[in-house]
Amino acid sequence: MLKLYDCTSAPSPRRTRMFLAEKGLDYENIQVDLEKGEQLSEAYRKINPGCTVPTLITEDGQALTENAGISAYLEALHPEPALLGTTPMEKANIAAWNWRCEMGGLMSAAEALRNSSPRMKDRALPGPKNIPQIPELAERGLMKLGWFFKTMNRQLSYNEFIAGDSYSVADITGTILVDFARWVKVYPQEDQTALLAWHARMKERPSYKA
């Protein structure tokens, strides 16, 4: 059986949980307490030297530590329902929008949080090394996040889902982005009706509660 090293409160492993839920796959869930620093323990470093979550242990015992790799692996083994696209153009659009949601959205929210929260002092970046906060990066992250919500709203004004006509990994990443942005008090605006309607639809999917 698959094993997932997880932290329920963190956005990154939630992406994996939602992907697994959409695929209908069973797995063993092992919690890593980030508040207590368990990701930095010697025991966990042996599993994932990068000291991050998620880590997915495959059925043959190999460790996958990045959402991009995890989703590619699971899609290859379990192609239905397709979350990475089926045609060359679908695959391209989904990959592009997933990257935009990650880099333009999730990274902006993380930049804002990790460079401002007192609880993350000297933890401005995930991983084994302590990195000092840079307050200006928090300010920039908030601005980028607001801009990206406008981009999402524009895209969803013409498409049912982020990357087109079908639900995909881009919708998983986008859903978690909107939820994670609340941590830094950034929300979709009232006039971003397409984004708000899309997020309401996403909350109705069973995988939302994964």
Stretches found by the model and what they are:
Residues 1-132:
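GST-like domain detector, emphasizing the conserved glutathione-binding G-site
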Residues 10, 171, 205:
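Conserved G/P- and acidic residue-centered "switch" motifs that form tight phosphate/ATP-binding loops
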Residues 21, 182, 204:
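Short polybasic/polar patches that bind polyanions
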Residues 44, 202, 208:
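An amphipathic, aromatic/His-enriched active-site/gating alpha helix that lines ligand/cofactor pockets
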Residues 54-57, 162, 209:
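Short beta-strand(s) of the beta-wing in winged-helix/HTH DNA-binding folds
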Residues 103-201:
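GST-like fold's C-terminal all-alpha helical module
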